[in-house]
Amino acid sequence: MKLVRGILFLALALITFIPAGSWAADDKKIVIGVTPFPHAEIVKIAAPLLEKEGYTVEIKEFNDYVTPNIALNDGSLTANFFQHVPYLDDQVKNQKYDIAWIAKVHIEPLGIYSKKVKSIGEIPSGANIAVPNDPTNNARALRVLEKAGLIKVKAGELVTARDITDNPKNIKIVELEAAQLPRTLDDTTASVINTNFAVEAGLIPAKDAIAIEDKDSPYANVLVVRKADLEKPAIKALAKALNSPEVKKFIDTELTPKGIVPAF
């Protein structure tokens, strides 16, 4: 009896200590974390292609840029799809995540929006301009403001407001969580907003932005997985589906008019 109890205890212990990130190579269930727009819509186009191959797809939506990488790294997700490459690189470096991108899908140009002015030239001296507060999008927003001729910034990747070298209009930079930026438009002169959050707020980047990032932006949004899973069949199938002709057609016809372009 003691021997039986000992074997049961050992079996339970082995089950308990299976790493959260372990994911069977023949697992037919794909759990993908996304932010709502346009990532969820894109995955919904890819899902039927995966279902034809015998996979089931569960989409989990997040409203921030932090939790999806935590959930992927700890094994709660099979993959995530919400971030661009520089943001991923920064997260891997600083949080020591064991994750990597496997496919580029689309580009969401960053735009400058305003309810107070209709053009960059109308932005007054002393204007308050809100930007994302995460390091990569913060630097990206400053480059958009520089491209618009409002400021000049030092060379480098992760620049901050402290790196502004010329600010002729004495613009005040306000740093906020990216998801909050559309709600700041009533209180700021302008805000630099990620396309996904702009569209969720009812804005149309191609029409409503008073300045927008170039379409050759290096900030492609990517499919991200744990490094240990890169060669697994389900991951390769997911990457193939997100780079399929069906997804490209959807982006070209439904999303490009809103400012989103394919990256494959």
Q: Predicted segment positions?
A:
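Extracytoplasmic "Venus flytrap"
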Residues: 29-46, 63-67, 84
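Short helix-initiation/N-cap motifs at beta->coil->alpha
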Residues: 59-70, 157-183
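A conserved helix-loop-strand patch within extracytoplasmic ligand-binding domains
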Residues: 102-151, 248
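Short, well-ordered beta-strand elements
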Residues: 26-37, 55-61, 128-129
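Alpha-to-beta junction loops
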Residues: 73-83, 127, 150, 169-172, ...
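A bilobed periplasmic-binding-protein/Venus flytrap-type ligand-binding module shared by bacterial periplasmic
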Residues: 109-120, 220-232
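Ligand-binding "clamshell"
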Residues: 90-102, 117, 187, 192, ...
